[in-house]
Amino acid sequence: MKNDNKANDIIIDSVKVPDSYKPPKNPIVFCHGLSGFDKLILIPSVFHLTNLISNSIVHNMAENFMQDDEDKSDNKYTNLLEIEYWIGVKKFLQSKGCTVITTKVPGFGSIEERAMALDAQLQKEVKKIESKDKRHSLNLIAHSMGGLDCRYLICNIKNRNYDILSLTTISTPHRGSEMADYVVDLFENLNALRVSQKILPICFYQLTTAYMKYFNLVTPNSPKVSYFSYGCSFVPKWYNVFCTPWKIVYERSKGCPNDGLVTINSSKWGEYRGTLKDMDHLDVINWKNKLQDDWSKFFRTTTVGEKVDILNFYLKITDDLARKGF
């Protein structure tokens, strides 16, 4: 890890495995981003997004846009790449002694809907955990939009049977995403569909840079919660699924380093712990390890190992939490 004595300049290009690892004494909760569920539906291009929304209109699903991942009665997702969310992370941390909860909220719901669904699930999950204390305390680790859900929950949902000790966000658009700006602009000017109802889920509007200015004003941090954050940046090859989104974000943000969807500046919230070097928006949930071999075979290239071991990255996060007494 390179540190230029400024938090904003911390570049993480490798992760050292802790010499003596001790898991946090309180459970870790993983909160997914846009799409999400137990599988991530990756949207690599605006074309696929257009096709997806068009299909939802045909199936009269506009008001419940992809809110139920369980429904696989047709092939409306065939043009999308589906991968498991948090690949291998839960099992790895459990093997190290961590208590881990993975959550599932409406993939394309609003921040408010997702936060309420997250709370409802946590209310149930904590009852399953044995504890000497009557009231459970949790450490939240969130990717992308999941971090906004968590901030809303902490700020606005009070009647809980659990406490939040910490929130660690990874590539969360705390100040919005220029890619969301682009998508909203595109569909507001897309006359070809000509439908009277709003076809773009509200979550896309909530992820814009303009909306997040409002969100941040009305969603203050809790003094009882410790906030940590990480960002990612990379420069894509032509075949990377984030190549076009990266260019859009780069141009609209006037040259800000980004991970293909979120700039480093937007990722910063609370104590900024550093920027993962050469990582795109999905590398941080370990998806590359799953697909890298097949991807390399497709392009007849040699598999290249990642500079940052993602499993060790999460091990370091949880080790840091444990050392802080969480």
Curated annotation (Swiss-Prot):
GO CC, sorted alphabetically, is:
mitochondrial inner membrane; mitochondrial intermembrane space; mitochondrion
Could you say which enzyme class this protein belongs to?
A: hydrolase
A molecular function GO annotation:
triacylglycerol lipase activity
List the catalysed reactions.
a triacylglycerol + H2O = a diacylglycerol + a fatty acid + H(+); 1,2,3-tri-(9Z-octadecenoyl)-glycerol + H2O = di-(9Z)-octadecenoylglycerol + (9Z)-octadecenoate + H(+); 1,2,3-tributanoylglycerol + H2O = dibutanoylglycerol + butanoate + H(+); 1,2,3-trioctanoylglycerol + H2O = dioctanoylglycerol + octanoate + H(+)
Keyword Aminoacyl-tRNA synthetase found: no
Q: Tell me the InterPro entries matching this sequence.
A: AB_hydrolase_fold
Short motif ((A/G)XSXG lipase motif): ranges: 142-146
Give the highest taxon in the source lineage. Eukaryota
Which GO biological-process labels does this protein carry?
lipid metabolic process; triglyceride catabolic process
Q: What does this protein do?
A: Mitochondrial triacylglycerol (TAG) lipase with activity toward long-chain diacylglycerols (DAGs) and triacylglycerols (TAGs). Involved in mitochondrial lipid metabolism.
The record describes the dependence of activity on pH as: Optimum pH is 8.0.
Q: Which residues form a coiled coil?
A: none
What compartments host this protein? Mitochondrion; Mitochondrion intermembrane space
Q: What is its main location?
A: mitochondrion
Q: Which Pfam families match?
A: Palm_thioest
Enzyme Commission (EC) number: 3.1.1.3
Q: What is this protein called?
A: Triacylglycerol lipase 2
